[in-house]
């Protein structure tokens, strides 16, 4: 079993929840092609501005992959402006394992996460990625921090 951190926006998190599917752009095919049924995916929602406030990055749920990767170009995901008009065609079906009542504050965990080697420039471990494999130890730390 492999553990994944899947990086998304608040808008696309709502779609994941509604449709039980994870999708990525074509350029991330190498990462998603390694996802197998039974793998566990943590959904990480990026920091965003809400009015004058900043809502920090958070982990909101755990899902299990229940399909192999498949291609579907229907436009269910919202592409951020910097990505143009991508459809996120590479997808995997999901089964919810746990949707956290209160999202996990990701920044509080950074000092203890093994996959983040540079704690000061931690965003570099996530920028430009749709998803990344994480160690089981980090998966357990994140999920044990949830309610």
UniProtKB/Swiss-Prot annotation:
NCBIfam families documented for this protein: PRK00809.1
Family annotation (SUPFAM superfamilies): PUA domain-like
Similarity comment text for this entry: Belongs to the UPF0310 family.
Name assigned to this protein: UPF0310 protein Kcr_0474
Domain of life: Archaea
Pfam families for this protein: EVE (PF01878)
HAMAP family recorded: UPF0310
Residue ranges that the Swiss-Prot or TrEMBL entry lists as coiled coil: none
